[in-house]
Amino acid sequence: MKNNLVMKEQLNIDWASLSFGYMPTDYNVRCAYKNGEWGEIEVSSSELIPMHMAATCLHYGQEAFEGLKAFRGKDGKVRVFRMDENAKRIARSAEGIMMPAIPADKFEEMVRKVVTLNERFIPPYGSGASLYIRPLEIGMSAQVGVKPAGEYLFLIFVTPVGPYFKTGFAATPYMITRKYDRAAPLGTGTFKVGGNYAASLRASCEAHAAGYSAEFYLDAKEKKYMDECGAANFFGIKDNTYITPLSTSILPSITNKSLMQLAEDMGMKVERRHIPEEELATFEEAGACGTAAVISPIDRIDDPENNHTYHISKDGKPGPVCTKLYNTLRGIQLGEIEDKHNWNFIIME
């Protein structure tokens, strides 16, 4: 492995122009679950997975994943943001679809190993890019009956990425959809599983085709309250209060959890509650938040079916609260701002 690393020293990447897409890297790490226990961590240079055509992940959706990032800081240190929360969330997602949870210590060991092995792909400080980390657990047993697999594979690969939205940190339009539901109130919406994203593809494609950044879902039961915002959580700002939906069909965002804490640190009130659609008209600022984009400020939200528009941004630009929250979170991730809550894990000094 050392010889391979020496031979692969030179990279010719325009870090500042990276898109949010897949780029091959040197190594991924894997761990198999067989006979009721997790095995040893293995390092692989292959991008392929040997898999039976009857594997449960292909037929019955036994698949859960995560997304987190490694950042090279101003001080040269490499930090991963809140990976303990990602370990908890993928464990919960796995258990939600009857898969064994990867132990938190093994999850952390694998993250550290895969980031270290692919150090040359960590974008430099100041480039605006980061190393995206994708953990994945899949059912591997060959079955044609609907039941949990007996064997599983947990793996992590990494790839350098640029901003999720080409516009970067800018206010963009969103649209409300009533034709589709992302997840049922007591379904898999709170788990990070592939089926939720498959269910959003048609609405997402229609929104993009119409010129919107993403689609907005209303609650599936009554179609009255704001729910998930594309593949991100929604929050609104008014009267010095950070307000985000309380729902049994929304993925609990680690970014949103962090922003709520930062809002409290800034002296704001935080509310998690139902947000009626008509309340959108009262927000001073609003955004969609998640690992990929951190915060995507909202310019306006269109409701095409009712021929109505909720204008959020007064000048088409991100508001002061969204901007401060974004800069603070990014500053913590990059080591520019004190990490008061001990969110960062130092991977390399």
Which residues does each predicted region cover?
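Intrinsically disordered, low-complexity linker/loop segments enriched in Gly/Pro
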Residues: L117, G139-M140
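Helix-start/capping segments and mature chain N-termini
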Residues: M1-V114, Q143-E349
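Short, charge-rich binding segments
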Residues: R120-G126, V146-P148
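Extended, Lys/Arg-enriched charged tracts that mediate electrostatic binding to polyanionic substrates
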Residues: P123-R134, I138
